[in-house]
């Protein structure tokens, strides 16, 4: 088993912005005053996304890019690692998300597409039912997985 992968899932941003539902519980997200319009920010985010995909491919990383669903207007869709993880044994885990808006990012069509491409899906563990009990664990946005030593590390937060 390896600690890192040569395969990445990326979701192309259709509506990139800060998320008012999650800003209070995300240390990396800040509301800033900007002279840039939302459209300027979206164009910049998309440009940076495409540049990153190019760099990753140049390093022989296999990239699976999916378009966000525009009508959902998901500001965080670029971070699929919060709703899903893929494991070498063929297990896919779907995580419970605190923000109702973020729950619309969870997409079985992506998992089906990946399983028909080259990723073996043996089983899906769907923990999203825990949202009803207000229990959340937002994937690798909440925890760091040490895959070699089979450990997970996390800090306590409203989303872990």
Residue ranges and their predicted role:
Residues 1-160:
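The feature marks the mature, well-folded catalytic cores of soluble enzymes
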């Amino acid at each position: 088993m390896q600690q890192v992968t040569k395969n990445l899932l990326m979701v192309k941003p259709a509506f990139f912005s800060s998320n008012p539902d999650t800003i209070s519980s995300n240390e990396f997200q800040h509301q800033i005053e900007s002279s840039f319009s939302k459209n300027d920010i979206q164009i910049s985010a998309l440009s940076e996304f495409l540049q990153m995909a190019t760099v990753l491919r140049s390093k022989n990383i296999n990239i699976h890019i999916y378009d966000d669903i525009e009508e959902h207007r998901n500001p965080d869709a670029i971070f699929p690692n919060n709703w899903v993880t893929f494991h070498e044994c063929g297990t896919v885990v779907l995580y419970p998300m605190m923000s109702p808006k973020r729950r619309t990012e969870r997409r079985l069509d992506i998992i089906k597409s990946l399983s028909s491409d080259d990723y073996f899906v043996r089983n899906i563990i769907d923990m999203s039912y825990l949202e009803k009990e207000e229990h959340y664990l937002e994937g690798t946005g909440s925890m760091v997985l040490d895959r070699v030593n089979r450990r997970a590390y996390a800090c306590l937060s409203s989303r872990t």
